[in-house]
Structure formats: structure tokens, C-alpha cells
């Protein structure tokens, strides 16, 4: 349920975001420090609840106004120029060659969430997904895109939602949506190693009970959209869009750790992974930040890169003579020389979210 809280604190927080957005629009040369402040505010304070006006506009289904969350998501994705003519041109091409698959998935999209069904029509989903399949034939359509697209349609007007959807899939995590979903497979391997690193006891218990990291393909591929409720998912996405969707791997681990007590007394714990408990975004984010602070730089760098490009995980493959690559003390044992160690100086100017490992998430942020 959406909280309709118009308290002085939330009004003040809303004004803070609007002032940041206004300053950024008027001072385009300050984009980097402005983005830094925007991300920092999201991390420390979150976004304020929606206003009555935003809720009413969204439930019209033809609402044309962009909510505060929508404005912030567009900024974080670098979507500034809206191209309605291009979108109409794609729609006019009609059903794509993936139409039958898209049609099957549309009816499953947040079908238990009444607020979603009031705000987003199946026609909107169909138009967006078929338009994407036309515009990006190399990616086409992969199951899970429907919920990702639906999330944008819930927050943004249709044309803007499409452009954000396109930007996310092609610029933030294209490796997840190749024909062999290679980025998702890499994410599963990274999840496996990081879970072992942060909780060796739980990891060993799962290993002895039919555990396999590919069990977590659905929450990774869906970017968290497979677990309700939707209003908590939006808070997770605020975090992901601010700091990178690679953090979905860490947040999935956090969800596993929050189930720890139940898992350790269950004879078939892996059955519980078919459906995670409902999202509690603040708890998941706080635990994820704690995990991030523990990670060695080489592991974090691979985590950052894997949604964008293929990463070499062979240095971290299990040695059959030594199944414990992690030594269980918070350090990674690896004698192989590789290029995935500390970040080179030439990367210092890169405005990617990997600076967050050393900057946004330091101990002074809480």
C-alpha cells in the first residue's frame, strides 16, 4: 500500500530533491557533483512518499505528469531527451516476431497487485515490449523483461518509461539479456562466491542440501521484480539506479541471509528459494551496504563489470584440490596474477558506480 504521508519532513525532503534537480538543470557543467549529491541523498534519506496528485495522475493510465521518482530515475539513467515520434514509429510497425511470447508474459506481470493493474494496462506493456523488440533486435525479448518494463510504466508516462526501459537494458545490464543470458550466469557465480565469503557456515549447510547458484537465476534476471510488494521494490530500484544494478546480486544475498535462521533448521532449505519473503527494502539495503564494505576490491570490480560485459571468472573457479577459494576470514586467497586487482589510475575519472565501494558506502555514511 502506498503511504500518503505529507509530513513536514517529507515536504522538506521533496523540496531538497526538487532543488537538486533544478540546480542541475540550470548548471549543466556541475553534473558530476550534482549526481554525487543526488545519490548520497538517496542513500541516506531515501525518496519521500508519493503525493496525492502523483497517485491520482498515475491511476489515470493516461497520466502525462512525471512524478518525483520518475524525474530522478530519468536523471540517473541519463534520459533527458524524450522522442515520442520515434516511439510512435516503432509502435506502428505492429507486433514483433516475439509477440506471442510477449503476449503470454503480459498477463503474468504483477497480476496480484491491484495498484499496478489500475495504473498500467496490458496494451501499454504490449506496445513497449514490442517496440523494444523492433528497436533492439539483437536482444529481442527475454522472459523477465515484462516486469522490468512494467516497473517503469508504473512510475513514468509511457514514452518516458519506454526510453528508460531501453536505456537500462542496453546501457546498464545488456549482458543479462543476451540469448544465453551470460551476465546472469556470471552473476550466479559471483553470488555463490560472495555468499561463501560472508557466511561460510550457511554456505556449507546449503552445499550439503542440493544447493546450486542457478537457483537464484529468477531474482537476478528479473532485477528483483519477482518478489513483492511493489512499493518496496521501487525503493530497491532507487538504490539500484543510483549505484548500479550489479547490487541486485548483493541484495539477493541479503535476502538469503535474512532467511538464515529458518534455512539452518530446514531439511530441504533450497525449496524455500522458490519464493523469497516479502521485500523489506531498508533492511535489505542496510545489510547489503554491510556486505559491500567487506568485499575485496577485485571481487567488487568484477561485480560492477558483469552486467555490462563478459568478465573473466576463471581466477575464482574452484580448485578441485582446494574447494575453499575464500579463506573464511574476510580475505580472498588468489595467487594468480590478473588484471582484476586494484583499480588502475586511469579509472579514476570514470563516473561509474564502482567509486561507491570506497566512497558512498564508507563507514561515515550511516
Swiss-Prot record:
Gene3D superfamilies: putative rabgap domain of human tbc1 domain family member 14 like domains (1.10.8.270), Ypt/Rab-GAP domain of gyp1p, domain 3 (1.10.472.80). Keywords: Cell cycle, Cell division, Cytoplasm, Cytoskeleton, Mitosis. SUPFAM superfamilies: Ypt/Rab-GAP domain of gyp1p. Part of a checkpoint which monitors spindle integrity and prevents premature exit from mitosis. It is found in: Cytoplasm, Cytoskeleton, Spindle. Residues 63-244 form the Rab-GAP TBC domain. Belongs to the BUB2 family. GO terms for molecular function: GTPase activator activity. Residues 314-366 are annotated as: Disordered. Residues 332-354 have a biased composition (Acidic residues). InterPro entries: Rab-GAP-TBC_dom, Rab-GAP_TBC_sf. SMART domains: TBC. One of its GO terms (biological process) is cell division. GO terms for cellular component: cytoplasm; spindle. This is Putative mitotic check point protein BUB2.
Amino acid at each position: 500500500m502506498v503511504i500518503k504521508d505529507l509530513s513536514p519532513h517529507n515536504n522538506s525532503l521533496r523540496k531538497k530533491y526538487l532543488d537538486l534537480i533544478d540546480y542541475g538543470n540550470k548548471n549543466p557543467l556541475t553534473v558530476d557533483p550534482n549526481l554525487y549529491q543526488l545519490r548520497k541523498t538517496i542513500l541516506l534519506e531515501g525518496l519521500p512518499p508519493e503525493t496525492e496528485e502523483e497517485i491520482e495522475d498515475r491511476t489515470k493510465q493516461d497520466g502525462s505528469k512525471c512524478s518525483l521518482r520518475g524525474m530522478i530515475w530519468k536523471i540517473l539513467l541519463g534520459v533527458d531527451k524524450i522522442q515520442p515520434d520515434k516511439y510512435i514509429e516503432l509502435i506502428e510497425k505492429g507486433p514483433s516476431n516475439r509477440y506471442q511470447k510477449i503476449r503470454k508474459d503480459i498477463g503474468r506481470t504483477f497480476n496480484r497487485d491491484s495498484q499496478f493493474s489500475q495504473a498500467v494496462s496490458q496494451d501499454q506493456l504490449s506496445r513497449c515490449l514490442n517496440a523494444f523488440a523492433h528497436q533492439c533486435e539483437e536482444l529481442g525479448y527475454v522472459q523477465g523483461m515484462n516486469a522490468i518494463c512494467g516497473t517503469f510504466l508504473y512510475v513514468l508516462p509511457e514514452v518516458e518509461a519506454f526510453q528508460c526501459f531501453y536505456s537500462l537494458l542496453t546501457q546498464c545490464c545488456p549482458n543479462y539479456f543476451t540469448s544465453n543470458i551470460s551476465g546472469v550466469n556470471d552473476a550466479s557465480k559471483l553470488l555463490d562466491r560472495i555468499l561463501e565469503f560472508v557466511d561460510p557456515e550457511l554456505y556449507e549447510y546449503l552445499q550439503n542440501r542440493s544447493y546450486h547458484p542457478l537457483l537464484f537465476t529468477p531474482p537476478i534476471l528479473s532485477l528483483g521484480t519477482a518478489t513483492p510488494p511493489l512499493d518496496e521494490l521501487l525503493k530497491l530500484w532507487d538504490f539500484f539506479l543510483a549505484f548500479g544494478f550489479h547490487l541486485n546480486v548483493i541484495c539477493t544475498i541479503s535476502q538469503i541471509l535474512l532467511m538464515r535462521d529458518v534455512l539452518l533448521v530446514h531439511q530441504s532449505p533450497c525449496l524455500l528459494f522458490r519464493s523469497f519473503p516479502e521485500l523489506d527494502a531498508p533492511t535489505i539495503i542496510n545489510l547489503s551496504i554491510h556486505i559491500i564494505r567487506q568485499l575485496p576490491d577485485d571481487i567488487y570490480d568484477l561485480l560492477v563489470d558483469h552486467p555490462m560485459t563478459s568478465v573473466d571468472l576463471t581466477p575464482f573457479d574452484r580448485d578441485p584440490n582446494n574447494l575453499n577459494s575464500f579463506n573464511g576470514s574476510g580475505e580472498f586467497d588468489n595467487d594468480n596474477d590478473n588484471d582484476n586487482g586494484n583499480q588502475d589510475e586511469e579509472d579514476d575519472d570514470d563516473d561509474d558506480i564502482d567509486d561507491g565501494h570506497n566512497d558512498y558506502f564508507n563507514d561515515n555514511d550511516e
